[in-house]
């Protein structure tokens, strides 16, 4: 999962 979008 990415930490930021």
Swiss-Prot record:
Transmembrane segments: none annotated. GO terms for biological process: neuropeptide signaling pathway. Its main location: secreted. The modification Phenylalanine amide is found at residue 5. It is found in: Secreted. The keyword Secreted applies. The keyword Transmembrane helix does not apply. Keywords: Amidation, Neuropeptide, Secreted. GO terms for cellular component: extracellular region. May function as a neurotransmitter or modulator. Belongs to the FARP (FMRFamide related peptide) family. This is FMRFamide-like neuropeptide. It comes from Gallus gallus (Chicken).
């Amino acid at each position: 999962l990415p930490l930021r979008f």
